[in-house]
Amino acid sequence: MTERLAIVGLGGSLARTSRSLAALRVALDGAAEAGATTTLLDLRELDLHMYNPDHEGEPPPAATRLMEACYGANGMLWSSPMYQGTISGAFKNALDWLHALGSREPPFLHDQVIGLISAAGGSQGLQAINTMEFAVRALRGWAVPYVVPVASAYRVFDSEGRLTDESVELQLRTLGAEVVRVATRFADDSTAQRARACEESAELVAAAG
């Protein structure tokens, strides 16, 4: 490919200092180092209204910005704190707004490659990752198998949200690069066609079952 891929990072929290946002920034750096152009959608800065299906026709400006950035991307990186065993309400609200993309062709985040990150106070960050994987499938995307659940996040970020653990930094940069690598393959028409064939086969199997 000659054009640089566009990777959008979505996440963070509503807190002034967000560990999940700091993790997302590092992963986006990894994507940029792999040759992609990157855009950050910080949930605190976006300040989205609560999703309302009645407003899909005329969404608020922040929701429009979110939807257009996500729909135009080749791939994404998602990052959420883990609250009560799952993703944050703010992150889920952002995903709810993406429901409005269902009327487009192709719909939702069709064939987009998505890398997943969570930041947890304990060791159960995979629970938030699992929730995100369900959402990726619902939005017709493809989650890369490599995920980064940052456990005991308070230990690997300082009080200003700066990452202090080299091992976690490497994992996050690797995830960013992996999203670019897989998205590059999907950008090849023949690869995308094979991916769609796999998706159609999976739908047929599900219908038969």
What are these regions (language model features)?
Residues 2-3, 8, 142-209:
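Glycine-rich phosphate/pyrophosphate-binding loop and the adjoining helix
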Residues 2-36:
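N-terminal beta1-alpha1 ligand-phosphate binding loop
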Residues 12, 43, 119-121:
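Cofactor-binding loop segments of dinucleotide-utilizing enzymes, especially the Rossmann-like FAD-
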Residues 35-50, 143-151:
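Short beta-strand elements in bilobed, periplasmic/extracellular small-molecule ligand-binding domains
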Residues 58-139:
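Helix-loop-strand module that forms the ligand-binding subsite of alpha/beta enzymes
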Residues 29-36, 100-103, 137, 141, ...:
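Generic secondary-structure signature for well-ordered alpha-helical cores
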Residues 43-60, 156-160:
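N-terminal beta-loop-helix "entrance" segment that forms/cooperates
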